[in-house]
């Protein structure tokens, strides 16, 4: 069966959308960062035809629903010139690759259990020249500091990885002192918040406004008492 190809879109059109979107988010990108993000969209479309990394195949929708969606959390995570970040269930590299591009001082680790997705992530590290990006394959609950990963993380992020309560249970052992868990969600997940495990609590609820996207988006910060 022939793989479906993504429709061709002029790069200038995508760049215009990216410029408009980052302005709406009050983010300033360098020319290099802007080109890296556009290259990432092109590579995601190219690999997606073979590896089915995302159900979204239109480059304009990839830019909106993947790149701008990931960029929408950046203003809320900023405040550290350096940070160790783990992206759990990263899939095609979202939001981790976007974070690594726009925050070169952060050390970003992508995690997924599917080897072909890790292979794509590793390829992106090379293609986009992201020296601050690393990839680890395996279940997040099995990752141990000093073994599979060098140390604990200041921020652990996910984008629709799992139920919020499950995400906290699986990843809390990797939170560094003073660190927290950040979960990107669509509609407000009241039931998931009610099921948060003991010793964890939502400390921030942020309603995200993703440019050009008419959909509900939220970002939750969760603190865990056993981060030590």
UniProtKB/Swiss-Prot annotation:
It is found in: Cytoplasm. One of its GO terms (cellular component) is cytosol. Pfam families: GidB. It catalyses: guanosine(527) in 16S rRNA + S-adenosyl-L-methionine = N(7)-methylguanosine(527) in 16S rRNA + S-adenosyl-L-homocysteine. Its EC number is 2.1.1.170. GO terms for molecular function: rRNA (guanine-N7-)-methyltransferase activity. S-adenosyl-L-methionine binds at residues 89, 94, 140-141, 159. Its main location: cytoplasm. Keywords: Cytoplasm, Methyltransferase, rRNA processing, S-adenosyl-L-methionine, Transferase. Belongs to the methyltransferase superfamily. RNA methyltransferase RsmG family. Specifically methylates the N7 position of guanine in position 527 of 16S rRNA. This is Ribosomal RNA small subunit methyltransferase G. It comes from Burkholderia cenocepacia (strain HI2424). The gene is rsmG.
